């Protein structure tokens, strides 16, 4: 539950609001306007959940119930920046467990509808 508590901290909630309201053309524009601190805070949190899920230390149903649609909404907002960061850093697996979490969550939701 510590992870869920972290999700509800002022720091994360404010980062989520800023990322959710960000308007940008590309990664250069995003970095110039906002920097990468907020995206990194959010992605690190969900990256950790993705690792726990991959290692079967958290259940996908629990992840869905705790973090719900926020995971998908933020992924949609952040995906282009995260992909550009991967390319720019030449790190193809940068925050890949966050993407793993999203993919597993989508499969779970599709199979439970």
Would you name each region that the model predicts?
Residues 1-113:
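Amphipathic alpha-helical "stem/stalk" segments
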């Amino acid at each position: 539950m510590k992870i869920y508590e972290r999700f509800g901290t002022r720091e994360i909630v404010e980062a989520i609001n800023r990322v959710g309201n960000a308007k940008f053309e590309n990664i250069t524009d995003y970095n110039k306007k906002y920097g990468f601190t907020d995206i990194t805070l959010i992605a690190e949190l969900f990256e950790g959940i993705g690792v726990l899920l991959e290692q079967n230390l958290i259940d996908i149903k629990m992840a869905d119930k705790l973090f719900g649609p926020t995971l998908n909404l933020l992924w949609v907002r952040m995906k282009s920046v995260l992909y550009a960061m991967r390319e720019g850093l030449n790190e193809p697996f940068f925050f890949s467990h966050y993407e793993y979490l999203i993919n597993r969550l989508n499969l779970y939701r599709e199979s439970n509808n």
